[in-house]
């Protein structure tokens, strides 16, 4: 499944003071020259802070870790745990779409979600 960044992006992203200190502590856990290994924890913290991973957050993490932005984008788009679009604040549903899950009936579950929540996948309901 191709994953793209949301068309609607915030102007900027910065870690809060607490999260910035946390990020620095994470980077210090890695040997010199291996700070890029902290990309997943930093993306996770960015998502925790704003509810999803925005393009400005990806740019911020890339600059913070002194790594190419495209490498951070690759990580963010590869792992489904990173939400590239805003998600609901009350509930967020994800249904496995792999072949084994489909064989066990995940398509039926997706259809129930479409009928009860939103006809369009990857969208927010009005409530």
Which residues does each PLM region occupy?
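Signature of N-terminal electron-transfer/Fe-S-associated modules in redox systems
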Residues: 1-127
């Amino acid at each position: 499944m191709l994953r793209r960044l949301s068309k609607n992006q915030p102007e900027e992203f910065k870690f809060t003071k607490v999260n910035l200190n946390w990020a620095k502590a994470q980077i210090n856990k890695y040997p010199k020259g291996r700070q890029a290994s902290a990309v997943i924890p930093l993306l996770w913290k960015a998502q925790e802070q704003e509810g999803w991973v925005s393009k400005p957050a990806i740019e911020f993490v890339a600059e913070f870790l002194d790594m190419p932005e495209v490498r951070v984008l690759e990580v963010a788009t590869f792992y489904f745990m990173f939400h590239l679009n805003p998600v609901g604040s009350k509930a967020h549903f994800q249904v496995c779409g792999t072949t084994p899950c489909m064989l066990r009936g995940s398509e039926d579950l997706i259809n129930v979600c479409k009928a009860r929540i939103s006809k369009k996948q990857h969208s927010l309901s009005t409530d």
